[in-house]
């Protein structure tokens, strides 16, 4: 087995899952830290309106880029199954098709993001007080979306063959670069909100470049050869079969969250800043969720490729328990210390109030959020990507939008908007629980 590759079809399940998930968790921790420090620097040096402009970016970015990140997950599923079955030639064709497809879509995504950002911001009821700063931030950010999308495709390839360590190293490098540039641009040169986007895209291109260099020089079977990068129709069809549902799932969730954000925006820039600060804190609860869902997708994909059905079930159970437990532990911390965390971003009383209430509403439901994401990851690894897409579309999109429409007709209260998240997390968890335990998804 070449350096970096890890075949998870035999050996201790807990050890393999933890050692695969841990680098992802640490990498995501560094990424979350630099996102948090980014907002801390913006909030403390540029003020509440700049913080509102930057903090509201997450939902639009997820809507625009999340689709292709979902396709990257689908590519990882295909590659991991061929890797588990030791069909190296087919795996190689899938890898080079993935890279070719990523290059094409990332180019078009850059253009779409730049030209449609103002329209999206107006549609989200972004206050005029932060509109100019928001447009500036987004246009600069989407110039770097090429690096962001390609990084996710490269990481999908690495994780499919069991390599979660190198992405950790590269995230550490890019995180440090991002923080240093933030301080240099904003604190020293006194540049505006656009400089925060500049720092982010530079760091994204660095991490993507490091991943590409590794894939070009590795001695492993997942090595990329530039002359072999092309679209193989058979493998593109397979990648899209698994990736499109994941991509649509991300876009659907992103669309619903944009609707939620537009409702929050109607309460003014203090609400935007408070909820934006909270979103950075909530990101820490997503760390174990993201880490173990990635581990679960790879683990299930490899073991189904090797027809190790019993290991799939044991690994799925272990991953779910770890993710749910860790996420809820972080939720309790957020519930207890939420106001202090929010104050670190912006000490304005209204900002603290809006952010703290958001955290107190959601904190005890993170275990359900983790469960939904874990089952979704397991089903994607098993090639059942349509199921989580449908569940998320109904529970996290239709129910959220319909619920907001009904609540807004009855009362204009931000507390009601906050509750839409735990309610829909609960609905999706119930649905996934029934499907997971009543349907033979493993052999079907």
Spans of model-derived segments:
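Short alpha-helical transmembrane segments in multi-pass integral membrane proteins
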Residues: 1-21, 79-144, 188-244, 300-365, ...
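Residue-level signal for short hydrophobic patches within transmembrane helices
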Residues: 10, 14-33, 37, 60-67, ...
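Transmembrane helical elements of multi-pass membrane transporters/channels
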Residues: 19-38, 140, 151, 174, ...
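Transmembrane alpha-helix boundary and packing residues in multipass membrane permease domains
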Residues: 24, 28, 40, 44, ...
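Helix-terminus/linker motif at the lipid-water interface of multi-pass membrane proteins
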Residues: 29, 33-51, 121-128, 184-191, ...
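Small-residue hotspots at the loop-to-helix junctions and early N-terminal turns
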Residues: 48-59, 134, 138, 197, ...
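Small-residue-rich hydrophobic transmembrane alpha-helices
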Residues: 51-111, 148-167, 261, 274-338, ...
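Short runs within selected transmembrane alpha-helices of multi-pass transporters and secretion channels
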Residues: 72, 140-159, 167-175, 196-209, ...
């Amino acid at each position: 087995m070449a350096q970096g590759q890890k075949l998870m079809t035999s050996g201790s399940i807990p050890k393999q899952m933890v050692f695969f998930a841990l680098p992802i968790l640490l990498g995501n921790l560094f990424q979350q830290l630099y996102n948090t420090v980014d907002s801390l620097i913006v909030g403390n040096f540029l003020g509440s309106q700049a913080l509102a402009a930057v903090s509201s970016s997450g939902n639009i970015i997820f809507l625009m880029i999340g689709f292709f990140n979902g396709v990257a997950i689908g590519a990882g599923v295909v590659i991991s199954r061929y890797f588990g079955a030791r069909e190296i030639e087919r795996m190689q064709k899938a890898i080079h098709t993935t890279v070719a497809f990523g290059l094409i879509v990332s180019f078009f995504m850059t253009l779409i993001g730049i030209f449609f950002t103002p329209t999206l911001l107006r549609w989200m009821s972004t206050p005029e007080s932060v509109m100019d700063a928001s447009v500036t931030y987004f246009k600069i950010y989407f110039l770097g979306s090429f690096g962001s999308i390609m990084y996710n495709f490269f990481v999908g390839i690495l994780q499919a063959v069991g390599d979660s360590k190198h992405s950790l190293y590269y995230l550490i490098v890019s995180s440090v670069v991002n923080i240093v540039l933030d301080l240099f641009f904003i604190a020293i040169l006194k540049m505006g909100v656009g400089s925060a986007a500049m720092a982010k895209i530079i760091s994204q291109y660095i991490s993507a470049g490091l991943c590409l260099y590794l894939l070009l020089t590795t001695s492993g079977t997942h090595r990329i050869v530039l002359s072999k990068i092309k679209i193989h129709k058979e493998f593109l069809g397979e990648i899209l079969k698994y990736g499109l549902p994941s991509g649509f799932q991300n876009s659907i969730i992103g669309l619903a969250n944009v609707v939620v954000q537009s409702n929050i925006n109607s309460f003014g820039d203090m609400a935007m800043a408070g909820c934006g600060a909270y979103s950075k804190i909530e990101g820490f609860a997503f760390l174990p969720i993201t880490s173990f869902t990635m581990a679960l997708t790879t683990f299930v994909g490899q073991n189904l490729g090797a027809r190790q059905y019993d290991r799939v079930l044991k690994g799925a159970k272990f991953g779910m328990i770890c993710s749910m437990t860790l996420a809820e532990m972080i939720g309790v911390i957020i519930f207890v210390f939420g106001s202090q965390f929010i104050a670190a971003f912006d000490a304005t009383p209204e900002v603290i109030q809006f952010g703290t209430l958001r955290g107190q509403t959601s904190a005890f439901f993170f275990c359900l959020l983790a469960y939904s994401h874990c089952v979704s990851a397991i089903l994607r690894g098993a090639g059942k990507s349509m199921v989580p897409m449908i569940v998320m579309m109904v529970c996290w999109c239709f129910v959220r939008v319909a619920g907001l429409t009904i609540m807004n007709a009855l009362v204009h209260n931000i507390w009601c908007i906050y509750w839409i998240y735990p309610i829909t997390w609960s609905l999706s968890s119930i649905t996934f629980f029934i499907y997971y335990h009543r349907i033979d998804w493993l052999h079907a």
